[in-house]
Every structure is written in C-alpha cells, then in structure tokens.
UniProtKB/Swiss-Prot annotation:
The protein's name in its UniProt record: Light-independent protochlorophyllide reductase subunit B
Keywords: 4Fe-4S, ATP-binding, Bacteriochlorophyll biosynthesis, Chlorophyll biosynthesis, Iron, Iron-sulfur, Metal-binding, Nucleotide-binding, Oxidoreductase, Photosynthesis
Any one GO molecular function term: metal ion binding
Presence of keyword ATP-binding: yes
Disulfide bonding pattern of the chain: none
Residue stretches of biased makeup (Polar residues): 498-515
InterPro entries for this protein: ChlB/BchB/BchZ (IPR050152), LI-POR_suB-like_C (IPR013580), Nase/OxRdtase_comp1 (IPR000510), P-CP_red_C (IPR042298), Protochl_reductB (IPR005969), Protochlorophyllide_Rdtase (IPR016209)
Length: 568
C-alpha cells in the first residue's frame, strides 16, 4: 500500500464508511489505532449533509495491546446505547487487521440489542470500491426477503452512496425521468435505505444499477435469486439516455407480462415531457453541438481518465455528441480495465500497427497518468482531482469527471451526470473548462488596455515553456517512486543580432535527448504571433523536432522548417 503517496481509492474501511454513512439505522465501528480515524473527518469535510458521519472508531492503543485490554465490546455497547442503530458493522483497519484478532468473539461478548455484522474488509486484498460494493452485496444477500411483486411498474435503484460523484443529483434526475414514465421507485440503496428497506427489494419489477463500481453485483444477485431483471447501463449523454429509456420501458413491459400485472403496456411519452418546463427539448446538446463555438471543438483533443463508469460515458459523450477527438483514455480500476478497454477500443486512436492498446492506460500510479498527459498535450483533460493537480502544473484545462474529488465537486446545487439534464451539465462543463484563448489572444494582439496582465519578463514564452519532468527518486522506504515536478527552462543568453547558420546550430557532442534548445529572439517573436491556445503545442513540437534533428538553437528558420515538417 502506497500510504506515502496520493491514492485514487481510499482504504477498505473507507468503503465500509461510505455504505454505513449512506444508510439509516446503520452505524460502522472501526477497530483501529488513533491514526486510522482519518475516515471520519473526510466525511465531515466533503459530505454536504447536516448529519454527523455514522461511524465510530474504537481506538486500539499500544498500552491496550501490552495489557491485553480490548475496548471493542465497550465501544459497541456505547454506540448501541447512544445511537440505537438497527445494525452495527464492525471492521478492522489496515493496521489492526495485522493483529489477527477474533472480532466475531469480541462482538458477541458485547451483548448489544442491535444486530452486529463483522465485515472482513481486508485492506491487503481490496480497496474502497471493492470493499463498498462487497458490503452492499452482503447486506442485500443478508436482508432481502421474498416479496409479492408490487401491483404497478416499479424499480429499485442501487448504487447512489455517500461521497459518490454527483450521486445525489443523479438520483434526482433518475426520479424525475421515472416519474415522467409513471414508474414507482421501490427502494433506493444504499443512500437513504434502512435494513427494513433492503427486505423489500424483491418486490420491484426491475433494478436500475447505473454505476459499475457500486450496486451491479447486488443487482445481479437479485436477478439470479428472484428473477428481477437488472439494467446496468449508465445513461450518460442524450443518445445513451434515449436508449436507456427505451430499454427500461421494454424491460418493464416484459416483466409486467410475466407477472400478469400490466393491463396497458408502458410507452415513451413525447420527449418534451422530460424537460424541466415540460414544453421544450429535454436537452440542448444536439443543437448546441452544431453551433460555431462547438464546431471548433472538432479539432480539439481530449484525454479521459477515471473510474470505469464515468470514463466510458465521458469518452463516448465527447466523441459522439460533441465531436471532439479522443487522444487517449484510461482507468485506475485495474480490475475493470478490460471492460473499459472493450467499451472504448473503437474510440481510441490506433498506433502504427493499427492497435488502440497504446492509447489506453490502466494504472493506479498518478505519476504515470501525469506523464501520459504531458506526452499527449491535449486541449482538455477529463479526470480526477489528481489530474487537476497535474494539469495545473502543465497549464492544461482539466475537468473533474470521476472520484477522487475535492470539496468543489460536492455541490449543493443540482449538477447531475446522468440523463438529459446531465448531458447539459457536461456540455457546459466542457465548454467552460476548455480554453478558447480568445481573451489572451486579443490582449496579445491589441495590448492589455490598462488591465492587470503580467507579460513574462524573462523574454521566454509564457508558461507553455514549462515542461513536466518525471523523475525516479528513492522514497523514504527505499523503493523508487515517480515524482512530478515542474520547472521552466533555464534562461540562456542568445546573441542579439548574430546570424546562426545551420552548420553551427547543430548540436555536436551532447545527445539530442539531453540538450534543451535555446530560442533566439526572432524565433520567440515569431512564436508569439501564433494564437495563444495552440502556441504551447507548437512550441513543444518545435522543441522536440529540434532535439531530434540536433539543433541546439531554435531560430526563425528552424521554426519554419519544423512547422513545414510537422504539417502546421
């Protein structure tokens, strides 16, 4: 476990906390040392709810271990008396699991009135996503009871959870679409559900589980055990939402015929019924994508990285509905990498051999992702909070589309990702994040007009001249780790009026991989005439061309030569 580094996923007991904090009448107790109680303040900081996190840490200290004292039964009794939960979930943290203690015996000795579930969330076998999904599946298997089907079309919604990416807004969007169809919601879990709600899950006609990371295994179990069909597609984008609605109607009609409870088949209403005002188109994306502003995006390249659900949905949305080019994609969920690749292989650019595999990245090491972004230099990155940090150093616009996130992505306002409303939200986010560069370009052309605009004083081009240097260095535990740092090229004095010939410009002794070309004033002046929003890529391509061809100095002639060779 790379505890010293940023991680895309939380630890296993963080996943347990997400499920417990989502549900009503459920409380998590972590058997952990003082340092492992960091999970509690994460929920306090990020979750926009008025309630305290539904979790307690039963502290294990060195003195307790030396004296053979066990605090867990006492903590369970205190939680039972103060909180009065229906269910207490007990799990060990990544530290205390090494003690190999019998938590089942400790829990039984507490004698609580609440039911106690000891969940084996081994942090050396699983992380946040698998832990949360495994716990939800366990709870569904434990509490679901055979039920008579409801008399009207109904669905379960599995997946929305505490600290989920825009999950609360997604749930509102799903509720609106289902209400428009006249479909009843039986149970939403884990968000807002109690263990008594889980008992009622088999009464639904179908189960909606839009997130591959959470809820789909439980939905499949319900399908296997009770014959409840599961819809596992994520309606991200206008066309996927239309397909999702048609499939939902078809599934419910088939279920109604099987159950002999549907006299009149469900039908899709006019699409205007799904809009906020009930009169207009449900989404503005189809016409907005054809405007002059969005037509310019057809020449822009995007790199997408995140979890499985949002990476696949965002790549298809950018290419199919906004017309952007996909420079590459990837996921940090390595167990989902094959599924993500199969979904996206038709969207990824192929290499010289015709295979798109080189454009796909499956890793949970954020430095590898930062290196890929630096190599591709796309106009837009859609990623996580980690990619936002990397892109800030690279001066590349970044849109957060998947966890892990920071507090600015846990909003009070209605910002769904799913459905027609989500398509509008995503289109707005792409448009406001990707840099048109017109304001800075106009300032370059006509001056700042008295505005506070700092022109670089070094004579070097703007921050596009900064480059990402990814270097291996030893960490404190002796293992090499990749580090990301940003630095500008060292300023070098260039001859003011000298003429540099092609022969004298050639780098002789150093290899091209170690020489950083120096820009002459005339080349810098020519570079500044290139629009701001493509200047960075032009500069990087010219510098790469110069290093490949052994030029130690980039003159105006070298710049022209490079642009002609590179086709631009």
């Amino acid at each position: 476990m790379r505890l010293a580094l940023w991680m895309y996923q939380g630890t296993a007991h963080h996943g347990v906390g997400r499920i417990a904090n989502s549900m009503r009448g459920v409380h998590a107790v972590f058997h952990a040392p003082q340092g492992d109680d960091y999970v509690n303040p994460i929920f306090t900081m990020l979750e926009r709810t008025p309630d305290f996190p539904r979790m307690t840490t039963s502290i294990v200290s060195g003195r307790d271990l030396a004296q053979g004292t066990v605090r867990l039964p006492e903590t369970l009794r205190a939680v039972d008396a103060q909180v009065h939960p229906d269910l207490i979930i007990v799990c060990a943290s990544c530290s205390t699991i090494l003690l190999q203690e019998d938590l089942e015996r400790m829990a039984r000795s507490a004698g609580t009135s609440a039911e106690v579930l000891v969940y084996d969330a081994n942090p050396y076998r699983m992380q946040e996503v698998r832990s949360a999904d495994g716990l939800l599946t366990t709870l569904v298997q434990r509490f679901a009871r055979p039920q008579a089907p409801l008399p009207t079309p109904s669905v379960n919604i599995l997946g929305p959870a505490s600290l989920g990416f825009h999950n609360r807004s997604d749930l509102i969007c799903l509720r609106r679409m289902l209400a428009t169809l006249g479909v009843q919601i039986n149970v939403v879990a884990p968000l807002g559900a109690s263990i008594h709600d889980l008992e009622r899950l088999p009464a639904a006609w179908a189960t909606i589980a839009p997130y591959r990371e959470l809820g789909q295994n439980a939905a499949r179990w319900l399908e296997d055990q009770f014959g409840i069909p599961a819809l596992t597609d994520a309606p991200i984008g206008v066309q996927p939402t239309l397909r999702w609605l048609r499939r939902l109607v078809e599934t419910l009609n088939e279920a109604g015929a099987r159950l002999q409870r549907l006299s009149t088949p469900l039908r899709l209403p006019p699409l205007t019924a799904f809009s906020l005002d009930g009169m207009s188109a449900p989404s503005s994306v189809p016409w907005f994508a054809r405007t002059a502003d969005m037509e310019s995006y057809s020449m822009k390249r995007a790199f997408v990285f995140g979890d499985a659900t949002h990476t696949v949905g965002m790549v298809k949305f950018l290419r199919d509905e906004l017309g952007m080019q996909i420079a590459g994609a990837g996921t940090y969920l390595e167990e989902e990498a094959e599924w993500v690749y199969q979904e996206l292989k038709e969207y990824l650019p192929p290499d010289d051999s015709g295979s798109p595999k080189s454009s796909f990245l499956a890793t949970d090491v954020f430095q590898h992702v930062a290196r890929r972004i630096a190599d591709l230099s796309p106009e837009l990155v859609c990623g996580t909070q980690m990619e936002r940090h990397a892109c800030r150093k690279l001066d590349i616009p970044c849109l957060v589309i998947a966890p892990p996130t920071h507090i600015e992505n846990h909003l009070l306002s209605y910002r769904p990702v799913l459905g027609f409303d989500g398509a509008d939200v995503l289109a707005d986010a792409v448009y406001t994040t990707a840099t048109l560069g017109m304001e800075k370009h106009l300032i370059d052309m006509f001056g700042d007009a008295g505005l506070d605009y700092d022109e670089p004083q070094t004579g070097e081009p703007r921050t596009e001249n900064q480059e990402l240097r990814v270097e291996n260095r030893a960490s404190a535990n002796g293992h090499p780790e990749a580090g990301v740092s940003v630095g500008a090229a060292e300023p070098s004095a260039a001859p003011s009026r000298s003429v540099v010939t092609e022969e004298s410009n050639r780098a002789t002794t150093p290899s091209s991989s170690t020489v950083h070309p120096v820009w002459t004033p005339d080349a810098q002046a020519m570079l500044k005439k290139i629009p701001f929003f493509v200047r960075g890529r032009v500069q990087k391509n010219v510098e790469r061309y110069a290093m490949q061809h052994g030029y130690a100095t980039i003159t105006a002639e070298v710049l022209v030569e490079a642009r002609e060779a590179l086709g631009g």
